[in-house]
Amino acid sequence: MCDAFVGTWKLVSSENFDDYMKEVGVGFATRKVAGMAKPNLIISVEGDLVVIRSESTFKNTEISFKLGVEFDEITPDDRKVKSIITLDGGVLVHVQKWDGKSTTIKKRRDGDKLVVECVMKGVTSTRVYERA
């Protein structure tokens, strides 16, 4: 199921993240602090639950979910969203919806890397992680 994603991942590169956060509606000060953070992602599977923990100097967050089941999420920038995460062709597709808006975050393996693509309207940010 999600075994290819299981492990601890450290951020090694980030492109266009500030523009993505701006499009999402994140304020200037939060964008600056979040943009400097180098989070680790810890992904695990516990029964039929997938757990994704993000740890950084900015904020620690954790979501646990069943694939295909909508859940309430509070994002690192404190948005209250409805989220649903599915597995589509080996890609974890995370859709967040709030206030008539939506963003999609895709996680996929590329060799020994974890590539996270964040899309909001026409703005895309790509963040690359390696095993920690």
Swiss-Prot record:
A fatty acid binds at R127, V128, Y129. The modification N-acetylcysteine is found at C2. The keyword Zinc-finger does not apply. It comes from the Eukaryota. A motif (Nuclear localization signal) lies at residues 22-32. Keywords: Acetylation, Cytoplasm, Lipid-binding, Nucleus, Phosphoprotein, Transport. The modification Phosphotyrosine is found at Y20. One of its GO terms (molecular function) is long-chain fatty acid transmembrane transporter activity. The keyword DNA-binding does not apply. GO terms for biological process: brown fat cell differentiation; cellular response to lithium ion; cellular response to tumor necrosis factor; cholesterol homeostasis; fatty acid metabolic process; fatty acid transport; long-chain fatty acid transport; negative regulation of DNA-templated transcription. It holds the Pfam family Lipocalin. GO terms for cellular component: cytoplasm; cytosol; lipid droplet; nucleus. Belongs to the calycin superfamily. Fatty-acid binding protein (FABP) family. Lipid transport protein in adipocytes. Binds both long chain fatty acids and retinoic acid. Delivers long-chain fatty acids and retinoic acid to their cognate receptors in the nucleus. Monomer. Homodimer. Interacts with PPARG. Forms a beta-barrel structure that accommodates the hydrophobic ligand in its interior. This is Fatty acid-binding protein, adipocyte. It comes from Rattus norvegicus (Rat).
